[in-house]
From Swiss-Prot:
InterPro entries documented for this protein: D-Glu_cyclase, Putative_hydro-lyase, UPF0317
EC number per UniProt: 4.2.1.-
Protein name as catalogued: Putative hydro-lyase BLi00500/BL02808
HAMAP family: Hydro_lyase (MF_01830)
Family: Belongs to the D-glutamate cyclase family.
Keywords assigned by UniProt, alphabetized: Lyase
GO molecular function: lyase activity
Enzyme class: lyase
Amino acid sequence: MHVNEMRPDEVRALIRKGEITGPTAGMAGGFTQANLVILKKELAFEFLLFCQRNQKPCPILDVTDPGSPVPSITAPDADIRTDFPKYRVYKRGELADEVTDISSLWEDDMVGFLIGCSFTFEQALMNNGIPVRHIEEKRNVPMYQTNIPCVPAGRFQGPMVVSMRPVPEEQAVRAVQVTSRLPAVHGGPVHIGSPEAIGITDIAKPDFGDAVTIKKGEVPVFWACGVTPQAVAMHARPELMITHSPGHMLVTDVRDEQFGVL
């Protein structure tokens, strides 16, 4: 069976066994995927406030109880220590390690935040005949740090990160309509067109993920991205912060359509 047709729990089981270690775009089609941020309880409120003030890049889907690795609302049989294909470990704002299991790092005062992911609306784009280039090219989605500032909260501040998908010019309006229905997974784009206008100097060199082909007659469309907390971590420099590796998400049990507003 192709991973696109698997149930979320089947995908998570393969990830837990180490049989899937790559990006999760297109897996368990129709189910919501989530970004991850893990912090010590003492920083959890500040980060929650940061997300509340920056709902476009950081729409919260679930928050674990302190010390619990179980996202009880979105995937009650999942374990956030093992069920992402790859994690990043930041120490004092520096990327210290990239691992496939964080069980050995888990402590009983940690809180996990699951943040909506734009992979969720890709099925809706494809259902509307809008191509998703990184899936076509079997690459990770390109992501860029911008000059768009987030609203600060305590020690958390920094620039917004965006993901980019090339869209045929005549379908750009439809892409806005389709994704605006799903505000819990970033919603409509934050920018269409000139990358330079939002501080991206070279679209062929993403800060995270992989470059993709932009064809003649296509326009780059940028959506707020849940990798934003990783850029913010580099500014806030918490003692320890664990995140997913960009593109390597948790596949939840929640269907995409449950987040639709129209």
